């Protein structure tokens, strides 16, 4: 099924409801501390403004629990202020996302003007994908556009439910870019195709690994999950984090990779500490085996070198999950080393959301990558080969 995109629709004079992802971090004063998600939605919003649509934006923010203070803490007002600055035009903020007051604001909205509805999750019906709530949201719209890839894996009222009750629907440019890059990296990659997979647990990445074994030429494994694989091969891992109940599964994954002639690379040296703390002494262990009393907290320099060489020789590189406890400086070299190697590569470089995206952002290398996914859970499910409700709703 082909994705229908916003530029294929006639928008002039229509009420265009765009589901965006403005779930942005705020400081204690309620100011936006990172506007990346707001900026990511600008191409779609600007397109609708220039097409003289009546632009209605909707998003969630945080996880409201129905407490009165949530209304102050989790209001979308800071996002409205920042968006107004970025667009250099007024953004009207509604005090709710449904109800008579909102209907009046929509009725009075002029072509090319922007209305931001208040936090969708102030209504529990949003996450329950309640039909009556979805119909009420749909009554505000002639056109429904999904540009919130970060929530595309959730079948909520605004991300999937209301699409059934709106005649015209499409994906925004951000969702289009996500599907294009993630789809291309996994569907028809330029080869050699190298995947870098990290993170703490094998159990979190089983489906990802299975899908990548079917598609990649090589998989470089880092993060704490590497110790479960090493232990499955009989390599001593000291007191590193290991999922004991996943050792058999790790063996099966290694066998499957071998059967498919996929190089599954594991660390050959490690950066270790006695405990996962910034203050712990940093010990480089120049061997696959980790001595008793130490735990692996990052890939070692030889491993990073091997992974760099694979990245340099690749035509497509996909990265999901850090190589170590990168939030703490002593254990961050592996993760930032991978980020720098990808940034220096002429290959199609795709970073699959979550911690890897945070690391790339921290390293200031976002613009050096072909694509950094804005979806953590959504990009993970996409890589696993699952259907995303928020994307399916945009298909023709």
UniProtKB/Swiss-Prot annotation:
Q: Mind listing the GO biological process terms from this record? A: gluconeogenesis; glycolytic process
UniProt keyword annotations, A-Z: ATP-binding, Cytoplasm, Glycolysis, Kinase, Nucleotide-binding, Transferase
Localization annotation: Cytoplasm
**Protein's UniProt keywords contain Flavoprotein:** no
Record-listed substrate binding positions = 21-23, 37, 60-63, 121, 154
- Record EC number: 2.7.2.3
**Assigned GO CC terms:** cytosol
User: Catalytic activity, per the record?
Assistant: (2R)-3-phosphoglycerate + ATP = (2R)-3-phospho-glyceroyl phosphate + ADP
Q: Is Cell membrane tagged as a keyword?
A: no
PROSITE patterns to which the protein is assigned, alphabetical: PGLYCERATE_KINASE
Q: What class of enzyme is it?
A: transferase
What's the main place this protein lives? cytoplasm
Gene Ontology molecular function: ADP binding; ATP binding; phosphoglycerate kinase activity
> Which of this chain's residues are annotated to bind ATP?
205, 296, 327, 353-356
Q: In which pathway does it act?
A: Carbohydrate degradation; glycolysis; pyruvate from D-glyceraldehyde 3-phosphate: step 2/5
Q: PANTHER family annotated for this entry?
A: PHOSPHOGLYCERATE KINASE, PHOSPHOGLYCERATE KINASE 1, CHLOROPLASTIC-RELATED
Q: What is annotated about its quaternary structure and interactions?
A: Monomer.
* Similarity comment text for this entry: Belongs to the phosphoglycerate kinase family.
Q: What is this protein called?
A: Phosphoglycerate kinase
- UniProt source species: Anaeromyxobacter dehalogenans (strain 2CP-1 / ATCC BAA-258)
Recorded name of the encoding gene: pgk
